[in-house]
């Protein structure tokens, strides 16, 4: 039935959004459903042919005017719904890629050690190109006149100045205003949030 494939994409987007929210953004982006998208585009192409046929038959007076208008209108609605489903799916994945780029401080994620081969395989070729160019834009922006401003910092002011954190993976020593911390997996620290916010975003630390 027309629209079933688009509905699958929407459900997949909802699952991805919920998973991403629950895991505090520390999750792999699911595989890009290229086959479903290709079939949706094929479906849209068939629907367009149907609209052209219905319009032609209506102009020739070979179909009942009310029936033809109803068929034509429903077919257009199916095309529009498929378009909205595709855009919603692509927009969600693009927003997640943007967030990943900012969380990595604008560094090239495709060559980052935190970006696994599975992460790369889950992206379409166009998404890989988009992510690389978006990271380049962030790098250029932060190396210009705004180099002294932390553009990747959170827009929400912290509720606590100092927080307890747990180390999720080894990160070595970090120098802060209050001393040096050796971040060893499973260790805990009471630190100033602004000093470790970047490490939290990158997945090295977890706020307790």
UniProtKB/Swiss-Prot annotation:
Keywords: Cell cycle, DNA replication, Nucleus
Entry-linked Gene3D superfamilies: 1.20.58.1030
Pfam families reported for this sequence: PSF1_C, Sld5
Entry's Gene Ontology cellular component terms: CMG complex; DNA replication preinitiation complex; GINS complex; nuclear replication fork; nucleus
Subcellular location(s) per record: Nucleus
Family: Belongs to the GINS1/PSF1 family.
Role description: Required for DNA replication. Functions as part of the GINS complex which plays an essential role in the initiation of DNA replication by binding to DNA replication origins and facilitating the assembly of the DNA replication machinery. Required for the chromatin binding of CDC45.
Subunit comment: Component of the GINS complex which is a heterotetramer of SLD5, PSF1, PSF2 and PSF3. Interacts with PSF2.
Full protein name: DNA replication complex GINS protein PSF1
Species name: Saccharomyces cerevisiae (strain ATCC 204508 / S288c) (Baker's yeast)
Gene, per the UniProt record: PSF1
